[in-house]
Every structure is written in C-alpha cells, then in structure tokens.
C-alpha cells in the first residue's frame, strides 16, 4: 500500500488518513513530526542519508541552499525523487519568504517589501505581491511558505500594523493569496511576540502581560484569522517566548496550557501546529533537543522545525522514539498529530 494508491481511492479524506496511519510503524509516525534543514546546494550524501535513514516529513530551505532558480528547482526535484524512492509520504518543502528582512535569494526572486510598508499601502498591493510570490515559489517546487507574520508591531518591519484589525485584514488576504497560488502558509508566532524584548534567536524573552491583554490585542489576531481561514490551508506557528501569567514554567512551544488548553480547546483550532525553529537560542540554550521535542509534542505541537544541525534532529528523533516506547507519548497522542499532518498533505497532494 502506497500513499498514492490510498490518496487516489474513493475513500473520504479522513478514511484515507486512518488507513495510512493504521499501516505505519511508530518510527514512521515519529518521522512525520520532523521538518529539517539540510546543508548544501545539491542533494549531497549527508542530505540523502537524512532522507533515507530518518525519513522525515519535510524539508525547509534557506539561502545556504539557494543560488539560482534552476538550481533550486533541481534540488527540490531531487529531494522529492529521493523521498519517493525511500517510500516516503510526500514531503512538505518549506521556505521563510515573508519579504523585507526575511527573504531568500532576494536578488533573483520577486522582491516583496517589509510587511510594515505593505500595511500602509492599499491591501490590493499586498495581495497582488503575495499571489506573484506564491506562484513563483510554487513553480520552484515549494509547497509551504512560513508566512505571513500575524504579530503586532514586531521589529525589523515584519508586522503589518500595531492595530489588530489591520493585521487580520492584511495577513488574512496574504494567506488567502498563497492558498490560491497552491501553497500552504503559516500564521506566526502564536500567541504573539510583538511584546517581546529579546531576539528569540538569541535567548528567552518574557512577555509579562495578562491573558486578558493578549486576548484583546496580540492573540485576538490569531483568533480572528482562525475563524475566517479555510481549514488545512495553513498552520499556526507557536513562538518560543514565555508568557508567565499563563504558564510560568514553559515557553509557548513547550506549553500544554498554551497549545492544548488555549489554542486547541478554548480557541477551537484543530489544524497543524508547527514550532518555530528549535535551534533558536530561546530553546537550545535551556533544553536538550530530545527533551524539547518530547515536551513540545506532549504540549500539543504537531511538527517540530529543526533547521540547522543534523545532530540536533537526530537527538530530537531519538528522544521522541524513546518517549513513544516508554509510554510518555501515548499511541493516541502520536496518532493525533500524524492524522492532522496527513490530512493536511492529502488536501493538496494526491
């Protein structure tokens, strides 16, 4: 039984996913939870090893992997070919292409201004650029863009506005444009990092405000976007910031109180939750990769981004496998995430 044969059957999407999951080993399920960065501009032996040995659920590319459109097309085609040869379910192929300060290969791809600049222009401009950029990324072989930013007033011009309603309007329009271009997209960084005071790439940042304040400001954006966006077209990316008035012990990406109790139960989001990069200092300075991977899945995350070091991805995988074997991560909890991931993949890849 292959992904393709099940995907093309007459079953409902949920039945297809149930059938796939019923025939997966624990190891194959765990691998769906990992999306990793690779090194090099070609599919070198190390990258092939990671695909064949660890059979991950997705790959994310950075400037280190990209030098020209033709080269990127070839690399992604080779990744997909290697994945298919290894018998993998189709891979998420991701990129961070927000525009402005966060843009890859910006000398050769459509130049998208910072969100702050777009937020001051007519919304049609933001929508048009997102459609053009999305179509370009799709043509290169990407299927998910980790954008748009849904935070309020973030530094480096990454936010559309400090006004929650304006961020909803612009981020929602941009997300819809990516979907129409054939890409999945991601609203980030739940529950909002506009009030952080430390770069999370460097270390932990504490957001010392109440849940009520977040609900009327930063998190209101995510709630409104979830209400208006089509299921399985997007993910919610959770931040590594700490919100001590909600959970004094864990950053958001490791917090059951924030992901399961708040985002899933209270807000009602049933889709895929992806972490921000676990190689960032906000987590990597304080946890082992095995521990953070296990804690994040127990908290309610589905996909763990490990973007830079193969060793860290291996530690995360080994930690997850140990937790599945000793029962800390139950079969039911593991299957929940895998089903969400496969249902999302099934929505665009047959």
What are these regions (language model features)?
Residues 33-43, 115-128, 203-217, 279-287:
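Active-site mouth loops of central-metabolism enzymes
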Residues 39-52, 125-136, 216-224, 287-295:
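Short, acidic/polar
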